[in-house]
């Protein structure tokens, strides 16, 4: 879903109108323009998804910088715990998540997922 949100943000940034965003999505993902039926259906789909996402609360994601591990001591059999620092997440910049974007962008992300999951994309890719 991260890649679909990234594509949706690009579509929103590069095109203002929904029809243009759908056209650009087809060009980027499938290498062709949508026909009029596809464009009309996908405009309705994105608008329906925008309404759906307005009603849904997307969870926010956080990344830990430390975790607690529990182990068993090899010779005595006693359990012990220690805190492990995860330096990889200290300066980590994650992709935008659903809870960080607008319902419209999530609707565009659904369009991107739809295209990414099409047989035509698998063939082009």
Predicted features and spans:
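Substrate/cofactor-recognition hotspot
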Residues: 1-125
């Amino acid at each position: 879903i991260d890649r679909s949100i990234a594509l949706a943000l690009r579509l929103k940034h590069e095109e203002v109108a929904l029809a243009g965003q759908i056209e650009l999505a087809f060009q980027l993902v499938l290498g062709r323009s949508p026909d009029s039926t596809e464009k009309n259906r996908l405009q309705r789909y994105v608008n329906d998804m925008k309404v759906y996402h307005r009603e849904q609360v997307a969870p926010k994601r956080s990344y830990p910088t430390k975790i607690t591990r529990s182990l068993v001591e090899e010779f005595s059999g006693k359990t012990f715990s220690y805190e492990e620092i995860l330096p990889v997440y200290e300066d980590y910049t994650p992709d935008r998540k659903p809870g960080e974007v607008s319902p419209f962008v999530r609707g565009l992300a659904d369009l991107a997922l739809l295209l990414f999951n099409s047989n035509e994309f698998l063939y082009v890719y």
